[in-house]
């Protein structure tokens, strides 16, 4: 197996190649990529948790240090100014020494403002990538070269195809997330609250709640009907009906994003519904291949949800085809099948069709689908079908021409369970699909 160092060198060579191309196309000499800056809380002396610029951590696995800078010209070694002040108030990261550091020119930056003296004097043909736009202008970057759209479109589009190094990092993130999921499931079985289940997850993964790639969704019972539920009750419910966990992990800046749903009672109708949705998710993934648009699989999943609604007698007296055509599946599956995954949880370029950034929106019928790409080898995506019992989405269907087809008594009996979501992370290969999640035997 190739070492992470050799994979990183190949990764860096690919990024250098992309940099040369995008610089030539846009008549630029170099890119100045900023890790970011701390953002102060209004009228306070504290800052919000730092979140690094994804374009920065694509080049180097530095994810928690603000005020760092990369100078990239596609030819020479990337220059990394690593922020390392003398500071007795706060802990300071030492200059890194790791598998990747010999591949860059590493220099300490004692003061954030010193970068102005470190950069070449001529900056008219330098593109800045980052969110501190005023800082870029203060450094003499021309306004049109601050986050130039053509540059970002090119880089975002190509970021969809993961290098071997990126895939290795994402597999490691999966391992960490799976450990957390197993610990959280044990906590659920022991009757813990949402808050304590989340603590068990963080302990198992070695993450702080500010380190996870997104806010953990730890939902018991009806809370699972809130798609992005993050409240975390401190007291467990009197009866544990269901548990939905949507939680991930990071490795070198790359994310895992996994979801599992469990029933409190193994013989319940809800438990059977979980089992059947799991089967449909696996069957759908058996059909996924390169060269097909992701949207097609989203539509196919609605057909599979219609099949479940019929077999569980939740919707009756109407064909599965008509259910999908008339939108009867949408209140039960209101979100998209999934999204690109990588440096960001909802990774870049889900709608981009080419290097120029041509946008293909989600179908109007499914506005919350996050990806319309043609699948290509090297892409990483989530596959996360769900079935929910959400009052606000079901309410409009309680009257009107299709109301008679909804088995409201059966649907209402499932509302205390909230809903189901099952999410795996897959890699598209030339002739197969790699399921990074199931490969680790996360049931």
Curated annotation (Swiss-Prot):
The keyword Metal-binding applies. Mn(2+) 1 binds at residues 257, 339, 384, 423. The keyword Iron does not apply. GO terms for molecular function: aminopeptidase activity; metal ion binding; metalloexopeptidase activity; phosphoric triester hydrolase activity; proline dipeptidase activity. SUPFAM superfamilies: Creatinase/aminopeptidase. Mn(2+) 2 binds at residues 246, 257, 423. GO terms for cellular component: cytosol. Pfam families: PepQ_N (PF21216), Peptidase_M24 (PF00557). Binds 2 manganese ions per subunit. One of its GO terms (biological process) is proteolysis. Transmembrane segments: none annotated. It catalyses: Xaa-L-Pro dipeptide + H2O = an L-alpha-amino acid + L-proline. Gene3D superfamilies: Creatinase/methionine aminopeptidase superfamily (3.90.230.10), Creatinase/prolidase N-terminal domain (3.40.350.10). Belongs to the peptidase M24B family. Bacterial-type prolidase subfamily. NCBIfam families: PRK13607.1. Splits dipeptides with a prolyl residue in the C-terminal position. This is Xaa-Pro dipeptidase. It comes from Serratia proteamaculans (strain 568). The lineage of its organism: Bacteria, Pseudomonadati, Pseudomonadota, Gammaproteobacteria, Enterobacterales.
């Amino acid at each position: 197996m190739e070492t992470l160092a050799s994979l990183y060198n190949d990764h860096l060579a690919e990024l250098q190649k992309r940099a040369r191309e995008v610089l030539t196309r846009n008549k630029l000499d170099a890119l100045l990529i900023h890790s970011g800056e701390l953002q102060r809380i209004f009228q306070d002396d504290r800052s919000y948790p730092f979140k690094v610029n994804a374009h920065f951590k694509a080049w180097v696995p530095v994810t928690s240090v603000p005020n760092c800078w990369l100078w990239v010209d596609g030819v020479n070694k990337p220059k990394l100014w690593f922020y390392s002040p003398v500071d007795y108030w706060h802990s300071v990261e030492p200059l890194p020494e790791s598998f990747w550091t010999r591949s860059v020119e590493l220099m300490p930056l004692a003061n954030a403002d010193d970068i102005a003296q470190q950069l070449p004097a001529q900056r008219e043909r330098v593109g800045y990538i980052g969110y501190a736009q005023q800082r870029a202008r203060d450094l003499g970057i021309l306004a049109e070269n601050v986050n130039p759209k053509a540059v970002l479109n090119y880089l975002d589009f190509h970021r969809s195809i993961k290098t071997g190094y990126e895939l290795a990092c994402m597999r490691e993130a999966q391992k960490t997330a799976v450990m957390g999921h197993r610990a959280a499931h044990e906590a659920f079985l022991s009757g813990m609250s949402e808050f304590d289940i989340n603590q068990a997850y963080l302990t198992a993964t070695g993450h702080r709640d500010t380190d996870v790639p997104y806010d953990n969704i730890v939902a018991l019972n009806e809370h699972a009907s809130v798609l992005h539920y993050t409240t975390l009750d401190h007291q467990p419910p009197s009866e544990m009906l269901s548990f939905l966990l949507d939680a991930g992990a990071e490795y070198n800046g790359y994310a895992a994003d996994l979801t599992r749903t469990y029933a409190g009672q193994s013989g319940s109708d809800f438990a059977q519904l979980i089992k059947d949705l799991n089967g449909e998710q696996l069957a759908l993934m058996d059909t996924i291949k390169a060269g097909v648009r992701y949207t097609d699989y989203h539509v196919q999943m609605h057909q599979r949800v219609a099949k479940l609604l019929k077999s569980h007698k939740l919707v009756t007296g109407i064909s599965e085809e008509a259910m999908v055509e008339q939108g009867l599946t949408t209140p039960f599956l209101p979100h998209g099948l999934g999204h690109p995954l990588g440096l960001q949880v909802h990774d870049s370029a889900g709608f981009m069709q080419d290097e120029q950034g041509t946008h293909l929106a989600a179908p109007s019928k499914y506005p919350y689908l996050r990806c319309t790409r043609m699948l290509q080898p090297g892409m990483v995506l989530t596959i996360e079908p769900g079935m929910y019992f959400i009052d606000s989405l079901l309410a409009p269907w309680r009257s009107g021409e299709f109301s008679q087809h909804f088995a409201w008594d059966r649907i209402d009996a499932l509302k205390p369970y909230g809903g189901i979501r099952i999410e795996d992370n897959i890699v598209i290969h030339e002739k197969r699909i790699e399921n990074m999640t199931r490969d680790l035997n996360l049931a």
